[in-house]
């Protein structure tokens, strides 16, 4: 997320590294300069700091994001608050447009106010700024963060920016005090899996019109609580989170916490490494073999916590249809729509991408924005439990055009590579 509407990097031509792999530092000072996810050019993520002096933190920062989270190294903090919003379950009118070669953003319309609630960790003045979803160059590795070297196909970010009209209030729960001052942003990250079962038929254009205006054919998936008639996971009928259907995940009866755990996409190698998080610079790059812990994911039977803090993955049906319909719409999908004054109006609840309230265990650390200018003023709240959307969402997002020639976001993705920072990560669960 960025506070700026960036130019397209191709508007000013493309630069390439010299024979020594070095890109010249430009004298540009614009904070809205264009940037790319093409890793072979000087506008790409490894060289963002050379594009503009405003982007210098991208190259020399001390708390850059995203990171690989090593679950057993994260420090448990007993008093970390539950993640909530005020007002609760508020449906917002948002507008989404084509963001060129970047992830489309759902931005609240004027007058729409929603705040993140993390009592004692931050004050109550962080206002909803946008929702966006990152994807990768491959279908399986699209999340920006990873846990123990494992990625998911996408990662949703709910971005909150501190209200400029209010003063920062002191926090009661400090995260080690390594970085003085206040964080301008709170960003909630959610790992998104994809699946086929239980998401119904592909919505047609007429159905999409109704869905984007907030009309859904059945009960709101954010319902009346984990055990109410409609439950937070109302997608599975009247039984809510504790209903008969539960959630069995991609692997049938085993679910995300079953024998197979969650194996991520590409195993143990992280972005570039031959040994997962411990390498990060080795031979196999995106296509490693087994994952740091072999066959059993973090939440599998042999995972870090087994069933004690297991995750029941929510099938986010309504979020799926909203994202699918939005990404398919011409105003978002077509590059030629960039700059048009009228975007696509979408009604959504920012809680839709989140796990059920009782499963909102999270990791938190002080990092940065993952796009230029890579501002180091972000409190990250990365959800441990995953959420599942339909495979059609991933397909639709990857087919959004990011270039004048019709090249889509599938070519370079919209994920920044893992950063090698030694930041301290805390967690709300044992």
UniProtKB/Swiss-Prot annotation:
First and last residues of every Sequence repeat: 225-227, 228-230, 231-233, 234-236, 237-239, 240-242, 243-245, 246-248, 249-251, 252-254, 255-257, 258-260, 261-263, 264-266, 267-269, 270-272, 273-275, 276-278, 279-281, 282-284, 285-287, 288-290, 291-293, 294-296, 297-299, 300-301, 303-305
EC number: 4.2.1.1
UniProt-annotated stretches for the region 27 X 3 AA approximate tandem repeats of G-X-N: 225-305
Tissues expressing this chain: Expressed in the mantle.
Ranges of Basic and acidic residues composition bias in the record: 207-219
GO terms under cellular component: cytoplasm; extracellular region
Cystine bridges: none
Annotated spans, Disordered: 201-312
Gene Ontology MF terms in the entry: carbonate dehydratase activity; zinc ion binding
List of glycosylated residues: 27
Matches recorded under CDD domains: alpha_CA_prokaryotic_like
Similarity remark: Belongs to the alpha-carbonic anhydrase family.
Protein name as catalogued: Nacrein-like protein P2
Organism: Mizuhopecten yessoensis (Japanese scallop)
Source taxonomy: Eukaryota, Metazoa, Spiralia, Lophotrochozoa, Mollusca
């Amino acid at each position: 997320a960025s506070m700026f509407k960036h130019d397209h990097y191709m508007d000013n031509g493309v630069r390439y590294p010299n024979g020594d792999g070095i890109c010249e530092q430009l004298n540009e000072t614009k904070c809205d300069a264009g940037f790319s996810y093409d890793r072979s050019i000087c506008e790409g993520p490894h060289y963002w700091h050379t594009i503009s002096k405003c982007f210098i933190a991208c190259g020399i920062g001390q708390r850059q994001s995203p990171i690989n989270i090593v679950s057993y190294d994260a420090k448990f903090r007993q008093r970390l608050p539950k993640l909530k919003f005020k007002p609760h379950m508020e449906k917002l009118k948002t507008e989404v447009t084509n963001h060129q070669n970047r992830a489309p953003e759902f931005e609240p319309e004027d007058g729409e106010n929603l705040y993140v609630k993390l009592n004692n960790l931050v004050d109550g003045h962080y206002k909803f700024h946008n929702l966006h979803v990152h994807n990768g160059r491959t279908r399986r590795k699209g999340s920006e963060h990873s846990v123990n070297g494992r990625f998911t196909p996408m990662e949703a970010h709910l971005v909150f920016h501190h209200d400029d009209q209010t003063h920062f209030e002191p926090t009661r729960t400090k995260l080690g005090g390594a970085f003085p001052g206040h964080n301008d942003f709170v960003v909630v990250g959610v790992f998104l899996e994809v699946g086929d079962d239980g998401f119904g038929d592909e919505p047609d254009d007429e159905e999409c019109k109704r869905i984007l205006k907030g009309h859904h054919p059945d009960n709101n998936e954010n319902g009346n609580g984990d055990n109410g008639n409609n439950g937070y996971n109302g997608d599975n009928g009247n039984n809510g989170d504790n209903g008969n259907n539960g959630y069995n995940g991609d692997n049938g009866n085993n679910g995300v916490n079953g024998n197979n755990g969650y194996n991520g996409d590409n195993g143990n190698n992280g972005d570039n490494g031959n040994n997962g998080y411990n390498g990060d610079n080795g031979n196999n790059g995106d296509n490693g073999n087994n994952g740091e812990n072999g066959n059993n994911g973090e939440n599998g039977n042999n995972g870090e916590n087994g069933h004690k803090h297991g995750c029941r993955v929510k099938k986010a049906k309504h979020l799926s249809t909203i994202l699918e319909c939005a990404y398919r719409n011409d105003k978002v999908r077509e590059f030629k729509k960039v700059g048009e004054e009228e975007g696509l109006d979408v009604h959504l609840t920012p809680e839709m991408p989140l796990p059920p309230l009782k499963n909102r265990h999270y990791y938190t650390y002080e990092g940065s924005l993952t796009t230029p200018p890579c501002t180091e003023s972000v409190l990250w709240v990365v959800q441990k439990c995953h959420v599942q959307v339909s495979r059609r969402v991933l397909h639709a997002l990857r087919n959004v055009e990011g270039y004048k020639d019709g090249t889509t976001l599938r070519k370079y993705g919209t994920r920044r590579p893992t950063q090698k920072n030694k930041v301290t990560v805390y967690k709300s669960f044992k």
